[in-house]
Amino acid sequence: MPEGPSIVILREAAGHLAGRKVLDVTGNSTQDIQRLRNRTLRGVHSWGKHFLLAFDGFSVRIHFLLFGSWRINEAKDRPERLGLHFSGGEVLNVYACSVRFIKGALDDAYDWSADVMGTAWNPATARRRLRARPDALVADALLDQDVFAGVGNIIKNEVLHRIRVHPESRIGALPARKLSQLVDEARTYSFDFYEWKQAYVLKKHYQVHTKRVCPRDGTPLSYRKQLGLAQRRAFWCETCQRRYGADTSAVAEPARAPRRP
């Protein structure tokens, strides 16, 4: 699933399409995508994992789910979910994704302060929302898009390793300093992810995600296919990542070579 930094990269790559008129619309979306024909694209935006195309009176929300992808001025050898053919010969194709229409202004639909890579990101708001969920696992809290819009499973695993917190720690048990580190590092790592992704070196910087040994102390990493309410893959080090709060979970599976993401 593309995480927030990847959507920012797409937003920047597609930004020049704003102001262009849609001359033709293709795709197998079940939505009424033909309403986009002869409309002028007013803006290209992102919120977390949502890619947003703004038109007069409404916007198109694209969520890339688990296997979605996109192409600008080229096509894949499979049917597109939505293809927008703009004036000037520009084309935007998106694949294997969810396409939805949003009525009205985007400001009415989105809380921009929750977007970890946005200019309106508010860490104080994130801390307040976390404190309202004292029993939540930190692994689930990081994936809560109402708190950390754009954070996905890779960022989750890497952030928790960076701040030395076990994924099954409870939010309410974290010291204030650790809670602040959790919030701050979610944003910091997202921008690191963005830079590495643009340079095509992201996977080279993984410390624990899909790895077998902790690079900090050499301990075999613990791995679970499904952890927390989110039921997402988790990789962590029992030596350097401290568990805060009561442990109510099962014993982790032994470390082993994980499947490719």
Model-derived features with residue positions:
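Structured catalytic/nucleic-acid-binding cores of DNA maintenance enzymes
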Residues: 1-261
